[in-house]
Amino acid sequence: MPPKPLRRAGAARSQRTSPEGGAGTASPPGGTRLEVGEAEFVALCDALKAPDSVREKAWMTYQSLAAADGASAYNKKKKETWGVCIFIVAIDLDEMTFTFTELLKSLSISVCTFFQFLKEVDVNMDTVSTKVDSTVSRLKKKYDVLLALYHKFERTCGLIYLEQPSSEISAELSSVLVLKNYWITFLLAKGKVLQMEDDLVISFQLLLCVLDYFIKLSPPAMLKEPYKSAVTALTVNGSTRTPRRGQNRNARASKQIDTDTKVIEILCKEHDCNLDEVKNVYFTSFIPFLNSLGVVASNGLPEVDVLSKQYDELYLKNKDIDARLFLDHDETLQPDVIACSQLERTPRKNNPDEEVNHVLPQTPVRAAMNTIQQLMMILNSATDKPSDTLIAYFNNCTVNPEDSILKRVESLGHIFKKKFAEAVGQGCAEIGSQRYQLGVRLYYRVMESMLKSEEERLSVHNFSKLLNDNIFHTSLLACALEIVMATYGRTASQSDGTSAETDLSFPWILNVFDLKAFDFYKVIESFIKVEPSLTRDMIKHLERCEHRIMESLAWQSDSPLFDLIKQSKEREGQTDQPEPTSTLNLPLQHNHTAADLYLSPVRSPKKKASGHPQSGTSNPDAQPSATSQTQKPQKSTSLSLFYKKVFRLAYLRLHTLFFRLLSEHPDLEPLIWTLFQHTLQNESELMRDRHLDQIMMCSMYGICKVKNVDLRFKTIVSAYKELPNTNQETFKRVLIREEQYDSIIVFYNLVFMQKLKTNILQYASNRPPTLSPIPHIPRSPYQFSNSPRRVPAGNNIYISPLKSPYKFSDGFHSPTKMTPRSRILVSIGETFGTSEKFQKINQMVCNSESHVKRSAEPSDAPKPLKRLRFDIEGQDEADGGKHLPQESKFQQKLAEMTSTRTRMQKQKLNDGNDTSANEEK
């Protein structure tokens, strides 16, 4: 611990008010004289009001850090290192006597710099606990949301208010005061309405409510169009601008409830927000918030000091970020240069004066609104009741499932609404109900598609068994709701469609419906197959959910998976062999459906297969053998498919980590994979309440150990943290035995090695075990095809998926190189620019025609139009002609396009002549 100073060096250094409001505690005891650095540490602790327990442990943490390899970096940043140590210890001991902003101010660093330095400390020492990880993750998400919202707030206010309003406007209503009032009111509303403050969508909708409220209170002379006209109309009608000093705010709030919605409609239209959703937030959350404030207005605006004082109480209670400092552009809240380059930005409109327009990524708020719009487009034709087609399917069942389906949807709706309000905020219950209805619409839509698909596949109409399966319906509804929750749960830092964690993130929906992850997994692939309108981000999210289930969620103690494995062993009378290794290098078939997986019981060995199909759908486990009626019982389809997918995911994870660590030892990969695969297949109990990656890292370490390859666990962990979709809890908190957790190293020594010691030692002998085949790794079945697709109806039009204007290999914001193919692009729905671009196209076409010698057409009738191939020179030309060898591919393309256009025009002319002739007759 640091020795006690002769005098308290930092007692008067800071006058900040702590949440406790008391003086700092005494310095830790000691008798030696302080050095300069130690005195500064004590001064920092004094400034933060750190108690003795935090000071002592923080100093010990710093000493451990300073004694480690590469400690010179920390010696150069002593103060920052002390701050990180104090922060870590205060969280671990639950003795936070300072706010996060106070810590940043004391260290004179920004949020981004602090997080980056904390990450560096963790890389070298692994001293950051999962509790600290969780706190840091929450702070990051809150900061990202606040930063995105403040940037949006600034830009929006610039579009609403005049920079220099007329002189008749009171100085008290200056733009600075208005902005401050807006922002603090929003922060207070956000803090009081939302328990889950990293919800970007509801936060933005709440911001629009605040904007609507203040715009109506603003003099029209301050406003730009169309807000000026909207407020003027309200003023003329006498529905607003009534409050003055001393008038009760509750009356003002209630006065505005029934006013014209023109302003909120404009705001929603400008920001592509759903009007009904914003109104819902306004009336169920924002109005109750206003009524709870009891603030007296001054010139139509609440007193800033009163609002600020209320927010201060909230900020000190949470001990996190003082978001009022965004108004001052405080350095602690400014993103670093690197972080700025990674922020998404709104695409610019095409500028006719610019030669080339690069489309930049979107802002977080714009991206969130767009994903919601995409979901609404999918659900445009869907209803929250079963369609006539679904009812017909229900009526065809032996036992009509309609009543049970409707009752289930209603009861689960009440549960969802309650749990949503508990997670987000009690004032948001109606928002949860609104989102549940969207999920129900998607649920019925996908159910109908599934039944149509099964009907075509099996030529049956009676799906009684499937439609009366409670787990199937709950899983299907949960999957539909997960799509909705992921769409609305997009976070400010989520730019690539991947799933960023929030309180409502998967597997939240499983906990709400008390649904097992293994049961939910069964519906995912079929859900994606039968709903072609799902966006790429939605599909990637569901794929990530499937991966999480295979990695850990399906291996929880109460999972049905272990029952299936046990029954599989008993049925086959052998060691746990859910999937033979001989199938690993075979392609994974995707011809199964959700019905196959939900209706695939593990059959008793004594039963004979029946040749009569059951009502509902065919059961792949109940198909009779071609050679004998008494067939050997087959494995559960769901278990077999699950293991096939797990093996392929496991190998992909292993291969990625292996490439980072052991690329110079390629002979070790098949050995590590064999041990890894053997453990998953034959020692499945090691996976109980654990993670796939824990077994992977232990397998890698074990093989390197017996092969005398120097690879430390610390090195494995450091590389593992750089992999996508990883969590530090995976290696910091591993189950050792019941209710006891420790690090991955302890797990290896006490559990993994004890169980597999004999097997691992075989790899050091001259006769190692037979190597497991490398799994056949196909392209994900959920990926969209990148090949152009022809539009039906006979038009010679091809549509290719939008290519990203940036390549990660060239840097984050490095535009792709323009090619002849992409040099001039026309985006439907956007202004193409000046007529000069069309003239350039015509000129290029004319120039190419003068150099191209086309072969004569054999007949007047046009040939069938083939899909053009531009990749192989001189091959499969549209008209069968050959190009000159000196022509560029671009000229060839233009020639082919010209030829196609000529034939189409000729065909159109001939058709017109034929029509005229017929009319004359």
From Swiss-Prot:
A GO MF term: RNA polymerase II transcription regulatory region sequence-specific DNA binding
SUPFAM superfamilies named among the record's database cross-references: Cyclin-like
Localization of this protein: Nucleus; Cytoplasm
Presence of keyword NAD: no
Gene3D superfamilies registered for this protein in UniProt: 1.10.472.140, 6.10.140.1380, 6.10.250.530, Cyclin-like
Secretion signal span: none
InterPro entries for this protein: Cyclin-like_dom, Cyclin-like_sf, RB_A, RB_B, RB_C, RB_fam, RB_N
Functional note: Tumor suppressor that is a key regulator of the G1/S transition of the cell cycle. The hypophosphorylated form binds transcription regulators of the E2F family, preventing transcription of E2F-responsive genes. Both physically blocks E2Fs transactivating domain and recruits chromatin-modifying enzymes that actively repress transcription. Cyclin and CDK-dependent phosphorylation of RB1 induces its dissociation from E2Fs, thereby activating transcription of E2F responsive genes and triggering entry into S phase.
Record-linked PANTHER family: RETINOBLASTOMA-ASSOCIATED PROTEIN (PTHR13742:SF36), RETINOBLASTOMA-ASSOCIATED PROTEIN RB -RELATED (PTHR13742)
Family of the protein in this entry: Belongs to the retinoblastoma protein (RB) family.
This protein's name: Retinoblastoma-associated protein
Organism: Gallus gallus
Gene: RB1
